[in-house]
A protein has these predicted regions:
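Conserved catalytic-core motifs characterized by acidic clusters
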Residues: 22-40, 69-72
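Soluble C-terminal extramembrane regulatory/interaction domains of multi-pass membrane proteins
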Residues: 43-185
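Short, small-residue-biased leader/transition segments that mark boundaries at the very start
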Residues: 2-6
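A conserved active-site cap/scaffold subdomain adjacent to cofactor or substrate pockets
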Residues: 11-12
Length: 185
């Protein structure tokens, strides 16, 4: 259906960017005329994998949401608010890095704010936002939300370890010391 067409187009676009970045890196290593572009190419390569992961994560989240609604189940209002905030942040990031945009000044101003907003979303994305009668799909959507937060923090320049540390722990033994924002407790 239409969703499959969109999925293929999105994945094709991401794959094209990954391939172009690799070609650009190879060319910049060989050609002295392109040596000055190495830093930009490395930055592009650094963000493309988390972008790819986020796109895939959104597709998985969408399938879970479809299953949830087909079963006539729901997620909590807190989960809806979290997803709404995350989608607004992702839109802002896509507009910031949009095709043909000049980077630099806008990034320096907007990225710190977007990172702070993502940290708050990560800090609120705990098991406690699932309704007491929450379904497996609600938990799966929460898991995907958390994964997308990590991917988007990495797009904004954080390491994976630092990004994961901004998630409210769901384990008694989190792999990375928590640096959680946006929680009252």
């Amino acid at each position: 259906g239409l969703g499959d067409v969109y999925k293929r187009q999105t994945q094709d676009s991401v794959n094209t960017l990954l391939s172009a970045a690799q070609s650009g890196r190879e060319a910049s290593e060989v050609s002295p005329l392109l040596w000055a572009s190495r830093r930009s190419i490395r930055s592009l390569e650094r963000i493309l994998m988390p972008v790819d992961n986020a796109v895939r994560g959104v597709r998985v989240l969408s399938r879970q949401a479809l299953g949830l609604t087909e079963d006539r189940d729901k997620v909590s209002d807190a989960q809806v608010e979290l997803l709404d905030e995350l989608s607004e942040i992702m839109l802002a990031i896509s507009e910031l890095y949009g095709q043909g945009k000049q980077h630099g000044h806008d990034e320096a101003i907007e990225i710190p704010d977007l990172v702070q907003r993502l940290r708050i979303v990560g800090g609120r994305a705990g098991l406690d936002i699932i309704d007491k009668d929450g379904t497996l799909s609600a938990y799966m959507i929460l898991g995907q939300t958390r994964s997308i937060v990590v991917d988007m923090l990495m797009v904004c320049g954080l390491s994976r370890e630092s990004a994961v540390a901004h998630l409210v722990p769901t384990s008694q033994h989190p792999a990375y010391p928590p640096e959680v924002w946006g929680r009252e407790d």
